[in-house]
A protein has these predicted regions:
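Glycine-rich, Arg-bearing micro-motifs that act as flexible, cationic patches
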Residues: 107-126, 130, 145-147, 260-286
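Structured core of small recognition/catalytic domains
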Residues: 192-262, 271-275, 279
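Conserved N-terminal glycine/acidic-rich loop preference
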Residues: 16, 20, 27, 33-35, ...
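Short, flexible helix-coil linker/hinge segments at the edges of structured domains or between repeats
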Residues: 77, 142-162
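Small/aliphatic-rich secondary-structure junction motif
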Residues: 1-53, 160-210, 230-232, 237-238, ...
């Protein structure tokens, strides 16, 4: 794996927002940015992973799009190393393969759409379930000011601190180590707090209230799981909560004030068909913050 951030673009507002977010992420990580456009170059077709159909005026559209994006990002982010490349072939396959060479792959997302209610198109959906590296989905409008806290005047920007990184953590689970490493690293790079949310199910007949014994075990498990990571990242302020029931709606709600939301995602053993848990699916539909899906087996 090379140390780079890769962003896939298609000319949509969502992918342009993803390119800006990816540039800022590359600067945070002190690595180059690689901009890619995936799909066959055809004279009259449609953008391969756009959330809505976008007409292609000619087979040079990909080259023009990549050039314009590279120039625009270089102007806004001087000092950032930027390269661009067209990836031929089936978009989901090409993007998933490209992700193997990156620290993170960034794609645009739509949020809760008016028509379909889906966050992203079929290709991005496939990439999230297939990519072997973390994939970040970014909504249009998720600019730098939305990632940062407002000052006393209600203004946010480069001079104000990042919002918390929010981690949806499933315990016990094989995904814990991978998502914890990604989330703590993201919080440390942003000098931000980390808010960890663990969802658990009480017994159907249990009446759970404050201080009830049923809540002790999940809380203790969460505390013990976080202990070595707190020691490894002493500068990250951590808050943790065990939420009864599915945490999807709660995570989507707290994403309003988050700079990044981190989830685990299981890699599919088969190359076809989506594989995504209900919590991840709900969060991806509703989150206002960029969502990082960290793969695990």
């Amino acid at each position: 794996m090379s140390r780079t951030v890769i962003v896939g673009i298609d000319g949509s507002p969502e992918s342009l927002a993803a390119a800006e977010w990816a540039a800022r992420e590359a600067l945070l990580r002190a690595v180059p940015l690689h901009v890619v456009h995936a799909g066959e170059q055809q004279p009259h077709a449609y953008a391969p992973f756009a959330t809505e159909a976008v007409a292609l005026p000619g087979e040079d559209r990909s080259a023009r799009m990549l050039h314009d994006t590279e120039v625009s990002l270089a102007y806004r982010h001087p000092g950032l190393g930027i390269t661009a490349e067209h990836l031929a072939g089936q978009p989901a396959t090409a993007l998933s393969a490209a992700a193997r060479e990156a620290e993170v792959l960034v794609l645009g997302s739509r949020g809760l759409g008016r028509a379909s209610g889906r966050l992203f198109g079929s290709v991005a959906f496939a990439v999230v379930g297939r990519a072997e590296r973390p994939v970040v989905l970014v909504r249009a409008g998720a600019g730098d000011t939305y990632e940062r806290r407002a000052d006393t005047r209600g203004i946010s920007g480069e001079a104000t601190p990042f919002g918390d990184v929010v981690l949806g953590l499933r315990l016990p689970g094989r995904s814990a180590e991978a998502v914890l490493a990604f989330a703590f690293d993201a919080a440390a790079r942003r000098d931000a707090g980390l808010r960890v949310v663990h969802g658990w199910n009480a017994m159907p007949s249990a009446r759970v209230g404050e201080g009830d014994a049923e809540a002790v075990e999940p809380a203790e498990l969460l505390t013990e799981t976080l202990r070595p990571w707190r020691e490894k990242f002493p500068g990250v302020e951590v808050t943790a909560e065990a939420v009864i029931g599915g945490p999807g709606a709660h995570l989507a709600d707290v994403s309003r004030d988050a700079s990044l939301l981190v989830l685990g995602g299981r890699l599919r053993s088969r190359p076809v068909g989506p594989h995504m848990g209900p919590v991840t699916h709900e969060v991806l539909q509703r989150s206002l913050a960029p969502v990082a899906v960290v793969p695990h087996r």
